[in-house]
């Protein structure tokens, strides 16, 4: 994964490098806890001078755009560092995150996360989960494509949940 942070997120976080490393570690622990044999590796982290728009969908579109004049240079950097997934960390508390969709290709493997939700709320791993074709829990999203069992899960006692389950509590 390659992570790009806005200057606003960098300033607000106090330690963006530590936050990104923790987000990667939490995501990898979630994979391990679920028996998913994937290891997320940080290909690089960068700070952009891009000024957030105030809209997650606009920021995501501008991040994905290759020739729109916003964050175009990061696409070449992505190729250089061989990152499969791109994450933009922003300082916008209107939501915790937004992925390009359920499932992804090289041109759609992009997500945006509010820096303060990236860890603890597990939104960093949550948005990556969507890019890997995982959906929210069936109560929140009953769609069964592309996988009938590709949903978040919460244990019957609520003692734990998967990262794409929409219930908010600590155990993951």
Predicted features and spans:
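Fold-level signature of zinc-dependent metallopeptidase catalytic domains
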Residues: 1-105
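The catalytic-center signature of Zn2+-dependent metalloproteases
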Residues: 45-61, 108-172
């Amino acid at each position: 994964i390659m992570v790009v942070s806005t200057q606003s997120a960098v300033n607000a976080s106090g330690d963006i490098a530590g936050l990104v490393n923790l987000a990667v570690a939490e995501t990898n622990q979630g994979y391990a806890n679920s028996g998913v044999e994937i290891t997320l590796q940080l290909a690089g982290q960068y700070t952009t001078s891009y000024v957030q728009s105030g809209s997650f969908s606009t920021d995501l579109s501008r991040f994905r755009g290759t020739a729109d004049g916003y964050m175009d240079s990061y696409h070449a950097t992505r190729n250089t560092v061989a990152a499969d997934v791109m994450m933009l960390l922003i300082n916008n508390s209107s939501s915790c995150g937004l992925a390009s969709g359920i499932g992804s290709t090289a041109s759609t493997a992009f997500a945006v996360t509010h820096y303060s939700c990236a860890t603890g709320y597990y939104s960093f791993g949550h948005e990556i989960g969507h890019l890997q074709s995982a959906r929210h829990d069936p109560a929140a999203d009953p769609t069964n494509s592309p996988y009938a069992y590709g949903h978040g899960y919460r244990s019957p006692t609520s003692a734990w949940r998967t990262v794409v389950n929409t219930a908010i509590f600590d155990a993951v």
